[in-house]
Curated annotation (Swiss-Prot):
Positions of the pro-segment in this chain: 1-130
Residues in the signal sequence: none
Record PANTHER family: AMINE OXIDASE DOMAIN-CONTAINING PROTEIN (PTHR10742:SF382), FLAVIN MONOAMINE OXIDASE (PTHR10742)
Coiled coil: none
Description of what induces expression: By addition of L-amino acids after nitrogen starvation, by starvation in phosphate buffer and by the addition of protein synthesis inhibitors, D-amino acids, or ATP.
Chain positions recorded as substrate binding sites: 237, 564
Protein name, entry field: L-amino-acid oxidase
Catalytic activity from the UniProt record: an L-alpha-amino acid + O2 + H2O = a 2-oxocarboxylate + H2O2 + NH4(+)
GO MF: L-amino-acid oxidase activity
Keyword Oxidoreductase recorded: yes
Gene3D superfamilies reported for this sequence: 1.20.1440.240, 3.90.660.10, FAD/NAD(P)-binding domain
Residues reported to bind FAD: 207, 215, 236-237, 440, 649, 658-661
């Protein structure tokens, strides 16, 4: 059936509640913008209708079901109050949704005329087509053929629902599904927030430890948050804006953190005890110290500052590199994307940038299929010696690119009182739904009942307790999940997912915080205010970060992150050193850099060491996929396997940041809502959290 554009426009002008429509027993309406190929149709009953019902879309003047443009649904469930409308590509505005009695063919319901946002629909289709363009690669390519496009704009929700054959939704039943979230880190907390705000009424959290926040861990060496002697033993900062040329951009993916803080402050009535407030983070300071080869300024007794180094380059050690190393470095730079252009793209839309990188970001080559080492040696024919000098790894350049953009940020933020205040703000929301000190170790799925059973215990000495759920969202890192037992075995039902759980690589970090009686670093001849700018060649120390909070504060002690180092070489190696020995080593390094007498007089004896590989609930710091693992594993995270949804920073496009965990929680929530046919709620979640690259 066809109707003219003029007729459609005329129909749109009709009043919404005509006498005929108002007298019918079924009220039909859409409640969200028709800007994609999916929508919910809401069904309300003013009177009962006997027998089955057919739903169609077509002319608002149609008198018979056969006159419709297309059929929407012929549900067998008489108790439905919502339909899932998969909208054909050749649809036109101006038509109405109609309901017909299948017993006698009579019209029993009709909506007001519908208007489609074709511009948005086309934009989504074009973005999807670009993200899934064919390649000669032998790697797995996720296209619209299988309904999921995980490399950039998340997944194709239309195809997902077509595959699931969902046409009607009992909303009350869907929203009462029993959902367990395993893990109360930031991805688990975000999942809980999204699902409950979407109206899910039976959501619980099972947490293996005794606190919320996971790897968000602020250590208060003296007092509380506003005694200002703390350090971040997990994440500690958020890139906010980046200036490239004459343009300044928001680092858009990290805006999720700031938006979440606003949301939690609002939910908590702006309570002072629960507030999440941001202050500037000082990433760099020109008075940071440069301590290499034992060189110090004889006048101050301190290493040269970065400002002094800039004024006198002879103070810096110069690494000898031969011409072939320089040439190889220049060749690599020529193949990588233009820095300013790609940094701007990543800042504005990390997800589109990721898709572009995978499809041909390495000068036309698929970005995730070349490791740094393999590209230099096998493609550019660099020597092993030159490649070693350039620190080529088994990872692709993606991590180098997005971390390069983040650490080029012009402004940064952190949370006043410590990042712990972000998970702290969730307590009023989740406490009644959270079970602490329950470590899930086994997961069983019953295909007949479609139920998930979680087996957990507090200690390895305890017997297992079990709980049954309709779905489980796994928000624990794979470094822990790899020790779990699944029934049926995942390598039989989802071998690529099982491969990801067992083989996704992680990086470990160690941090040592030391407390001092005063903020002595702010009273040096060239005072240091915040920043991680002090560096040295003392083995195993890495970054030294001075606090960005309470700058020029006069009361009480303060703490320095005296060592922050990661990677297989030191993040793993330090765990074999006893804590007291490790702390003494770091204290000695601080004394060597800042002056032995000063440091020993100022040190209070309070410290904290956290090597994340020793944490029984984490076993590592963050995911660090090797070459090919993004391209191979990301599609698996977008598929619901045995009623399990996997979230966490390890399932995101970037790693090691709170924003990565939050993004995965939003994605997992939308994935589950779409599984249940709650399209309007999925759209609302997407729109609220600005994740508009999902096609729903």
């Amino acid at each position: 059936m066809k109707w003219s554009a003029a007729a459609g426009a005329a129909l749109l002008a009709l009043p919404a509640n005509s006498a005929v429509t108002a007298s019918l027993p079924l009220k039909l309406e859409t409640r969200s913008s028709l800007n994609s190929r999916l929508s919910n149709i809401h069904v309300e009953r003013s009177a009962s209708v006997e027998g089955a019902i057919s739903y169609t879309y077509g002319s608002c003047q149609a008198k018979r079901e056969e006159e419709a443009h297309h059929s929407i649904s012929q549900p067998t469930d008489a108790h439905h109050d919502r339909l899932v409308w998969v909208i054909p590509e050749n649809v036109q505005s101006g038509g109405c949704i109609s309901a017909w009695s299948r017993a006698n063919g009579r019209l029993v319901g009709r909506s007001r005329p519908q208007s489609f946002d074709f511009k948005s629909i086309k934009m989504r289709r074009d973005l999807k087509a670009r993200a899934t363009k064919p390649s000669d690669s032998v790697a797995i390519h996720m296209t619209t053929d299988n309904g999921i496009n995980p490399w950039g704009p998340w997944f194709d929700g239309v195809k997902l629902l077509e595959d699931k054959e969902i046409s009607t939704v009992d909303v009350e039943k869907a929203k009462s599904k029993n959902i367990a979230i395993v893990g109360a880190g930031m991805s688990g907390l975000m999942t809980y927030l999204c699902l409950t705000q979407a109206g899910m009424t039976n959501v619980s959290i099972i947490e293996g430890g005794n606190r919320l926040g996971g790897r968000v861990h602020t250590e208060y060496l003296s007092g509380g948050p506003f005694d200002y002697s703390y350090q971040e033993m997990g994440p500690m900062r958020f890139p906010n804006t980046i200036t490239l040329g004459n343009e300044t951009y928001n680092v858009s993916d990290h805006q999720l953190v700031f938006q979440l803080a606003e949301e939690m402050n609002s939910l908590n009535g702006h309570s002072k005890n629960l507030s999440v407030d941001f202050i500037p983070w000082y990433q760099s300071n020109s008075n940071g110290l440069y301590y290499y080869d034992g060189i110090k300024n004889p006048e101050t007794g301190l290493p040269p500052t970065l400002a002094e180094l800039a004024a006198n380059s002879s103070l810096a050690l110069t690494r000898v590199s031969n011409n072939s190393t320089k040439s190889l470095s220049q060749k690599v730079d020529a193949f990588l994307p233009d820095t300013d252009k790609f940094f701007a793209e990543m800042a504005q839309n990390m997800f589109k940038a990721h898709a572009d990188w995978l499809s041909g970001g390495l000068a036309g080559l698929p970005g995730d299929q070349w490791s740094e080492f393999g590209f230099m040696v096998n493609y550019l024919r660099g020597s092993l010696n030159d490649t070693a000098f350039l620190s080529a790894s088994a990872h692709s350049y993606w991590d180098t690119l997005y971390e390069g953009m983040y650490f080029s940020a012009s402004t940064w933020k952190t949370i006043d009182g410590g990042l712990n205040r972000l998970p702290l703000s969730f307590h009023p929301l989740v406490d009644n739904a959270t079970t602490l000190n329950r470590r899930v170790e086994r997961v069983a799925f019953d295909a007949e009942t479609q139920k998930v059973t979680l087996h957990s215990r507090n200690s390895y000495k305890d017997s297992f307790e079990s709980s049954e759920h309709d779905y489980a969202v796994i928000a624990a890192p794979f470094s822990i999940v790899k020790k779990w037992r699944f029934s049926p075995a995942l390598d039989l039902t989802a071998p690529t997912l099982a491969n990801a759980i067992q083989n996704l690589e992680y990086t470990s970090a160690c941090k040592v915080a030391l407390e001092f009686r005063t903020r002595f670093w702010e009273h040096l001849p060239q005072p240091i205010y915040g920043s991680c700018s002090t560096t040295s060649d003392i083995p195993g120390i890495g970054s030294i970060c001075y606090p960005s909070y309470n700058i020029n504060g006069t009361d009480g002690p303060a703490s320095i992150l005296a060592s922050y180092i990661s990677g297989a070489d030191w993040g793993d190696r330090w765990v074999s050193t006893p804590e007291e020995e490790h702390v003494q080593y770091v204290l000695n390094a601080m004394a060597e850099i800042h002056g032995e007498e000063l440091v020993k007089e100022q040190y209070t004896g309070q410290f904290n060491r956290r090597c994340w590989a020793l944490d029984p609930l984490e076993s590592a710091s963050w995911a660090s996929p090797t070459v090919g693992q993004h391209e191979l594993y990301l599609p698996e995270y977008f598929q619901t396997r045995n009623n399990l949804v996997f979230v966490g920073e390890h399932t995101s496009y970037t790693h090691a940041w709170i924003a990565s965990a939050l993004e995965s929680g939003i994605r997992g929530s939308v994935q589950l809502l779409l599984e249940l046919g709650l399209v309007d709620e999925a759209k609302a979640t997407v729109d609220k959290w600005m994740a508009r690259w999902i096609d729903v």
